[in-house]
């Protein structure tokens, strides 16, 4: 569970590593995850999230407030 983005839900993918002679060897493709701290004005506190670069771009585009509201709605339905 530690290699999952908390915003987008991206997980490691499996595939093949190919050598020059096209021999296949199993490998994993990991998302570009980073630990990042965000300030929430509404709650007056910091939160720590483990997010992918795509998740960070979503936060830059829409703002942490909208993204957090969408996440809470997503987790309430499950």
From Swiss-Prot:
The keyword Ribonucleoprotein applies. Residues 1-23 are annotated as: Disordered. GO terms for cellular component: cytosolic large ribosomal subunit. GO terms for biological process: translation. Keywords: Ribonucleoprotein, Ribosomal protein. One of its GO terms (molecular function) is structural constituent of ribosome. SUPFAM superfamilies: L28p-like (SSF143800). PANTHER family: 39S RIBOSOMAL PROTEIN L28, MITOCHONDRIAL (PTHR13528), LARGE RIBOSOMAL SUBUNIT PROTEIN BL28M (PTHR13528:SF2). NCBIfam families: L28. Belongs to the bacterial ribosomal protein bL28 family. This is Large ribosomal subunit protein bL28. It comes from Wigglesworthia glossinidia brevipalpis. The lineage of its organism: Bacteria, Pseudomonadati, Pseudomonadota, Gammaproteobacteria, Enterobacterales. The gene is rpmB.
